[in-house]
């Protein structure tokens, strides 16, 4: 059986469906007892990028959770190969001013226990999302709903949210402002999934903690969740079950990437991400797929370290960095050196964002600029009353993964050599960095990244909106805030895009963060598996409509 190598490369910014293609040397054993050949059942098995701590769509914030949730919940709409298709809602009407959406639910939409899916299930879920008592890490995604942000901030009662179940099959949604990507957003973000109030209240804080403490409305149901293996089986009550080819999918979390690759070679996985150390062995044989994840360093401008609150020092960090050399040293040139915030493959002005706007004309040079770095450093030291650069120490926090350590060690070397400052490294677990360190602002500089939740630059730019719950940098710029607010109400799509681009320019001019790279993520896929979709927004991978060819 041949292996198929798939790469998510920056150059392609579109949704692509995988089909059988080029192979790589060697063969992959097949040891699955319940494969389609032996049992008549169609099954795929693959690894997750990180642990799957919860299937509560409003208390999760990782791609792994989103990938699992979109398969187990029926959304109002569904993103299928880049197109918005009806799901639990069979149709919808949009008011002339773009503020009111009326969704008409299917009468045959059911939960896995046979109960009907109702408009009230969506109303309850969305109110739970923005309710401060829920403390959802993704509550901000409901800002587009009427009064959503005010409710999140405790300024209004949750009953004032712009969502109303008119009757069992009619849901009326009122937006805070026209949102061109709204149908895409609710079709790819698990936070907008329906929830059964009786089930949530029955299990309380244990809701969705295990497979049996939930009911499911989507194409699959979770049947077990033990020992870092999550099993999903086809939902016979799903309204579109005849379009679902797989009988079962197993998601595995294996921390060691070498072990993941060994499992794939042994035939225990159908799909695996290629460890960075092995990418050079495969990348010339790769197919091209898009991935919208960009990596950067957050700078906590309000940390206890005063140098990071200084604009000139932040600019010195950015100009001192040779991103091309960094990419070669840290990533073996397997990623793409990047000097912006917004993924250039997003749609803008009838083309892509990268084509519409010349990033290099307003950002830092990819090769760095030592003279400018020195100029900004000297200005910062003068303003801060620091005599010697060697008296400056900054700390970079990252996860305990080997690849992350290699990345920050490369940054450490470049910054120390170019600026003469001292750079310390602190490593914590993945769970801690996103669960405590970043949200609690317990860091100075932090290596992280972001992938767009929807096909719009706003998804990246809102990270630097002063009142965003994901403003880990504690960055504040009234002009940026005003541009982002204005963009939400701007009916002229081209003018709106210009406002968003100006916000990106202002953020870069402030040195608010340190852009590093766009991820080129490589995957290997069994040739007998087809129909998996890759996206540069939100999920990255969608296996709902996957199929397995007969062996």
Each language-model region and where it sits:
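Extracellular/periplasmic solute-recognition and catalytic clefts
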Residues: 223-233, 250-305, 324, 328-329
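Surface-exposed binding/hinge segments that line
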Residues: 123, 138-198
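N-terminal lobe/hinge region of extracytoplasmic solute-binding protein
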Residues: 47-96, 215
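Extracytoplasmic/peripheral linker and loop segments enriched in polar/acidic and small residues
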Residues: 365-366, 422-433, 459-527, 551
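Structural transition elements
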Residues: 336-380, 401-405
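Gly/Pro-rich hinge or "lid" segments in bacterial periplasmic/extracellular proteins
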Residues: 63, 175-244, 248, 258
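Long beta-strand-rich cores associated with HINT superfamily self-processing modules
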Residues: 523-551
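Alpha-helical secondary-structure segments
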Residues: 118-125, 168-174, 218-219, 246-248, ...
């Amino acid at each position: 059986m041949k292996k198929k190598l798939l790469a998510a490369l920056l150059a392609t910014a579109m949704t692509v469906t995988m089909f059988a293609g080029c192979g790589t040397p060697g063969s992959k054993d097949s040891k699955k007892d319940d494969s389609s050949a032996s049992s008549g059942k169609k099954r795929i098995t693959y690894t997750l990028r990180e642990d799957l701590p919860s299937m509560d769509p409003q208390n999760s914030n990782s791609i792994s959770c989103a990938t699992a949730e979109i398969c187990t919940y029926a959304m109002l709409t569904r993103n299928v190969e880049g197109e918005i298709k009806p799901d639990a809602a069979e149709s919808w009407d949009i008011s002339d001013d773009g503020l009111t959406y009326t969704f008409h639910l299917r009468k045959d939409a059911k939960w896995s226990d046979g109960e009907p899916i109702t408009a009230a299930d969506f109303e309850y879920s969305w109110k739970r999302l923005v309710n401060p008592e829920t403390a959802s890490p993704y509550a901000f995604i409901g800002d587009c709903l009427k009064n959503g942000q005010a409710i999140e901030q405790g300024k209004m009662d949750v009953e004032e949210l712009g969502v109303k179940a008119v009757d069992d099959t009619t849901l009326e949604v009122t937006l805070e402002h026209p949102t061109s990507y709204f149908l895409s957003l609710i079709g790819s973000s698990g936070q907008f999934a329906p929830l059964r109030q009786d089930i949530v209240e029955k299990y309380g804080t244990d809701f969705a903690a295990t497979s049996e403490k939930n009911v499911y409305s989507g194409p699959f149901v979770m049947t077990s969740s033990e020992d870092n293996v999550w099993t999903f089986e086809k939902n016979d009550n799903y309204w579109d079950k005849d379009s679902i080819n797989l009988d079962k999918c197993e998601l595995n979390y294996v921390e060691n990437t070498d072990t993941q690759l060994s499992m794939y070679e042994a035939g225990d996985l159908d799909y695996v991400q290629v460890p960075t150390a092995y990418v050079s062995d495969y990348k010339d044989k790769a197919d091209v797929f898009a991935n919208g994840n960009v990596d950067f360093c957050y700078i906590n401008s309000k940390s206890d370290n005063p140098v990071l609150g200084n604009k000139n020092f932040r600019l010195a960090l950015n100009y001192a960095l040779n991103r091309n050399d960094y990419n070669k040293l840290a990533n073996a040139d397997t990623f793409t050196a990047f000097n912006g915030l917004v993924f250039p493959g997003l749609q803008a002005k009838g083309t892509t964002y990268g084509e519409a706007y010349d990033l290099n004309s307003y950002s830092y040079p990819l090769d760095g600029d030592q003279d400018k770095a020195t100029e900004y450093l000297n200005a910062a030291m003068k303003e801060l009353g620091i005599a010697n650069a060697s008296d400056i120490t900054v700390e970079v926090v990252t996860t305990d993964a080997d690849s992350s350590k290699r990345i920050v060690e490369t940054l450490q070397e470049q910054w120390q050599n170019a600026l003469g400052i001292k750079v310390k490294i602190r490593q914590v677990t993945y769970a801690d960095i996103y669960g405590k360190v970043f949200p609690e602002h317990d860091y100075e500089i932090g290596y992280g990244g972001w992938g767009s939740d929807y096909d719009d630059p706003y998804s990246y730019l809102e990270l630097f909106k002063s009142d965003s719950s994901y403003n880990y940098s504690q960055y504040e710029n009234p002009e940026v805030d005003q541009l982002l607010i204005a963009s939400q109400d701007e009916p002229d799509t081209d003018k709106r895009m210009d406002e968003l681009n100006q916000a990106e320019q202002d953020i870069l001019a402030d040195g608010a963060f340190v852009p590093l790279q766009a991820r080129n993520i490589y995957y290997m896929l069994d040739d007998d598996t087809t129909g998996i979709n890759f996206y540069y927004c939100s999920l990255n991978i969608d296996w709902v409509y996957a199929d397995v060819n007969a062996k």
